[in-house]
């Protein structure tokens, strides 16, 4: 306890630096999942991908990043196991951030796409096992988290298969694929915007003071989705778009439409990634800051400091700009 009282401010500053390091590594490495395919397909260049991803990663981290942070902060280990030794929890969280941040940067330097979530959860579990033991781990919560690592790829594969089959039947296997793509492309745009808005409004905007009911969230999201669909219809019917398509009888026009859809979904994925993975950096930081601010109190709900979320968002954007190119190239063209 004396450690926290005497060196509390220094510990917060050091943890903030380590949190920024972790966010830097996440931005540099994990963003390849969002933009690598767009680069590999030739839709955009690596430089364009970095600029686009920075914008949406930052937006996702700030607007919708607070929800997952609570899980990293107190959903993996039992905070009450450290009630009588809060300094151990503080030092353990700092060690976890340092280890995870260094590993992500090393992996990025080597061009290896790795998971920031796996890294930080493993680090937190490791320090808890060494200091307190297996009783400090919330195994039920952890089982759900680990289960999602297996369920998510399966669900993503199923959804991707359904969308692909749907696209083939509605667009590619028709006699006029370009005409069909112009017809159904705006629908895909609207669905993407609808999902993005639902997640952002319902999960992320509470920390900026916007609390809406389920029906209000649904209505706003549906309205924005319809607007996006209408914009898509108008653009695909415009002379500007027609002039960009050289072969209207073949698949070049279809590729042009799907390149726009791919870019839109990549932006949505970057936003979702920012909202989810920023928690890996700020969760431990939020825990340390709250414990020191409350004089060593570990248990009970805590309010996240206002500066924590923006710090993680900026760190992710900075890491993406400085080191994101190598991993993005691996996913885009190296696999």
What are these regions (language model features)?
Residues 1-335:
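Alpha-helical transmembrane segments and immediately membrane-proximal extracytoplasmic
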């Amino acid at each position: 306890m004396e450690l926290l009282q005497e060196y509390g401010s220094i510990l917060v500053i050091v943890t903030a630096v380590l949190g920024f390091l972790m966010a830097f590594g996440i931005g540099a490495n994990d963003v390849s999942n969002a933009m690598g395919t767009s680069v590999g397909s030739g839709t955009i260049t690596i430089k364009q991908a970095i600029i686009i991803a920075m914008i949406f990663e930052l937006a996702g981290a700030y607007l919708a990043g607070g929800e997952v942070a609570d899980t990293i902060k107190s959903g993996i280990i039992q905070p009450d196991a450290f009630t009588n030794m809060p300094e151990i929890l503080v030092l353990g969280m700092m060690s976890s951030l340092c280890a995870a941040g260094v590993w992500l940067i090393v992996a990025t330097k080597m061009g290896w796409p790795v998971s920031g979530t796996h890294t930080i959860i493993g680090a937190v579990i490791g320090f808890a096992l060494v200091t307190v033991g297996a009783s400090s781990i919330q195994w039920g919560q952890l089982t759900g988290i680990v289960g999602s690592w297996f369920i998510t790829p399966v669900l993503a594969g199923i959804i991707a298969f359904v969308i692909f089959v749907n696209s083939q039947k509605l667009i590619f296997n028709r006699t006029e694929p370009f005409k069909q793509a112009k017809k159904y492309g705006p629908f895909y745009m609207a669905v993407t915007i609808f999902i993005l808005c639902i997640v952002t409004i319902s999960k992320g905007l509470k920390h900026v003071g916007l609390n809406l009911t389920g029906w209000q969230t649904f209505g706003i999201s549906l309205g924005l989705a319809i607007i996006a669909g209408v914009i898509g219809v108008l653009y695909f019917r415009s002379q500007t778009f027609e002039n960009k398509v050289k072969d209207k009888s073949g698949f070049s026009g279809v590729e042009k439409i799907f390149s726009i859809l791919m870019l839109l979904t990549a932006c949505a994925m970057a936003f979702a990634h920012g909202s989810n993975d920023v928690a890996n950096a700020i969760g431990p930081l939020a825990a340390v800051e709250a414990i020191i601010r409350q004089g060593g109190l570990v248990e009970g709900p805590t309010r996240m400091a206002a500066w924590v979320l923006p710090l993680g968002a900026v760190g992710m954007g900075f890491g993406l700009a400085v080191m994101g190119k190598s991993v993005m190239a691996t996913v885009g063209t190296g696999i």
